[in-house]
């Protein structure tokens, strides 16, 4: 039950983040808030993971992000930061994670200053959704580094907005870590019944 509660809370937080982001973007378009436009490459370096899919290990200690929506495990980490992960092919999903992890070679890793962490995650998520819907009916094989570098990002002058986004995203990550720990304990205990 606690696991389901955490999952429900995470879904709710994701919806809340999206709603607040859409509201901010609407306010920006109507002139109700001020700020400036930039692109992802102005906020962070963009790199890819170096590992192939065989790098995963079922009992690994660290998360291994691939182009799948499912997160695998591995034995070695290459990154240790609050990061945005964008699948360069396959499902074209966008994830966020704070901690030690590794990434597949077609997964883009963005590590912005913490001030812009949630904002860049939301901008990336909406741009990738837009990219997928614009390509509807045609085959999109991959997303390029240039596509990622040019993700548009609106930065509001009111820093309280950024703080709100970051607090909600960090809360979501905390619930996810607790859910993962509970699932691990459940999986360890079930065979003992």
What is each residue range found by the language model?
Residues 1-68, 157-193:
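Non-catalytic DNA-recognition/assembly elements of restriction-modification systems
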Residues 35-156:
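DNA target-recognition domains and sequence-specific DNA-contacting regions of bacterial/archaeal
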């Amino acid at each position: 039950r606690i696991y389901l509660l955490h999952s429900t809370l995470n879904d709710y937080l994701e919806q809340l983040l999206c709603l607040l982001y859409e509201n901010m973007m609407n306010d920006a378009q109507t002139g109700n808030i001020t700020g400036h436009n930039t692109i992802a490459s102005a906020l962070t370096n963009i790199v890819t993971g170096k590992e192939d899919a065989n790098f995963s290990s079922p009992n690994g200690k660290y998360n291994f992000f691939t182009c799948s929506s499912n997160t695998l495990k591995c034995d070695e980490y290459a990154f240790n930061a609050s990061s945005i992960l964008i699948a360069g092919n396959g499902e074209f999903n966008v994830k966020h994670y704070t901690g030690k992890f590794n990434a597949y070679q077609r997964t883009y890793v963005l590590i912005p200053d913490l001030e812009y962490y949630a904002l860049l995650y939301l901008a990336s998520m909406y741009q990738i959704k837009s990219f997928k819907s614009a390509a509807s009916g045609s085959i999109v094989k991959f997303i390029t580094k240039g596509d990622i570098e040019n993700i548009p990002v609106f930065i509001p002058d009111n820093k309280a907005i950024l703080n709100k986004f970051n607090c909600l995203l960090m809360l979501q990550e905390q619930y996810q870590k607790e859910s993962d720990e509970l699932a691990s304990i459940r999986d360890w205990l079930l065979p003992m019944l």
